[in-house]
A protein has these predicted regions:
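Short aromatic-glycine-(Arg/Gly/Cys) micro-motifs in beta-strand/loop hairpins
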Residues: 17-42
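Acidic helix/loop or adjacent segment enriched in Glu/Asp that either coordinates divalent metal
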Residues: 49-63
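Short N-terminal "domain-start" leader segments
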Residues: 1-25
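Short arginine-rich
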Residues: 60-72
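Short, highly charged C-terminal tails/helix-capping segments
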Residues: 71-81
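A short, exposed loop/beta-hairpin motif centered on an aromatic-Gly-Thr core
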Residues: 38-53
Length: 81
């Protein structure tokens, strides 16, 4: 699992098995006390055969985050996610 700290947020990779497919996510939490985690599915057109593959894809997505906006949305260095 890859994790990165930004000025007001922390982001990390996440994955989930749904049926026979795994999905990749970027999880984001504000550093404000009591903030909730939000999950953003990445590579939404792709399904992965295993959770490990989904984590690898999510790790890549986390590494490409430029910043996180005020609504806890990640801004990536590429536009297809």
């Amino acid at each position: 699992m890859r994790q990165r700290a930004f000025s007001n947020h922390i982001a990390w990779s996440a994955a989930q098995l749904k049926g026979d497919r795994a999905l990749a996510y970027v999880a984001i939490r504000s550093t404000d006390p009591g903030a909730k985690v939000t999950y953003h599915q990445v590579f939404i057109k792709n399904f992965f055969a295993s959770v490990d593959e989904a984590y690898s894809a999510a790790d890549e997505a986390v590494s490409r985050i430029i910043t996180i906006d005020a609504r806890s949305n990640p801004i990536f260095s590429f536009s297809d996610h």
